[in-house]
A protein has these predicted regions:
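Polybasic/polar functional segments that serve as interface/processing modules
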Residues: 1, 28-33, 56-58, 97-100
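Arg/Lys-rich, positively charged N-terminal/basic patches that mediate binding to nucleic acids
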Residues: 1-24, 116-133
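Preference for short coil/turn "hinge" residues that link or interrupt alpha-helices
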Residues: 2-3, 17, 34-38, 76, ...
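Generic detection of intrinsically disordered/low-complexity segments and helix-coil linkers/edges
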Residues: 4, 8-12, 59, 77, ...
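N-terminal first-folded block
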Residues: 8-55
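Charged, alpha-helix-enriched surfaces in structured cytosolic catalytic cores
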Residues: 10, 24, 63, 75, ...
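Basic/aromatic recognition patch in beta-strand/loop cores that engages polyanionic ligands
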Residues: 42-83, 87
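Enriched for short, Lys/Arg-rich terminal
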Residues: 70-124, 129
């Protein structure tokens, strides 16, 4: 271990269903957060909201998925929404404002409040599938 605290990664209920349906692995989500922590953020939308690309299973990022993540560097990342680039070009102004407001609220939660959300199955913790074999 390098002594750095590990980023806690979560996905909300909607995103968990989306990822399952689209075959997006937890390993891919962990990789996206690791890239963000390294400064490789695809789009910083402000207010703790970032857009990260995630590759399709067996494909590259360019034809893959766009994910919206509530993000606090090296502390917390919560996958909130995802879409295929072929399905949606970008967020409109109302959607962007709504997600920024949600990011502000969710990132302000204490760890105890996050733990409650996990117990109530409104959030699901993401673990690296490859490291848990």
């Amino acid at each position: 271990m390098n002594g750095k605290p590990q980023t806690r990664i979560y996905k909300n209920r909607w995103f968990a269903k989306f990822a399952s349906r689209e075959g997006i692995s937890d390993t891919a989500l962990v990789a996206a957060v690791e890239q963000a922590n390294s400064g490789l953020i695809d789009a910083d939308l402000g207010g703790g909201l970032i857009k990260q690309r995630v590759a399709r299973e067996g494909g590259g990022k360019s034809g893959g998925y766009r994910t919206l993540v509530f993000f606090r560097h090296e502390e917390r990342a919560i996958f909130a929404f995802g879409f295929a680039k072929s399905d949606k070009a970008n967020l409109n102004a109302v959607e962007l404002r709504t997600y920024k407001q949600a990011a502000k609220i969710v990132l302000a939660l204490t760890q105890a409040q996050i733990d409650t959300e996990v117990r109530e199955e409104r959030l699901f913790e993401v673990t690296d599938d490859a490291k848990n074999l």
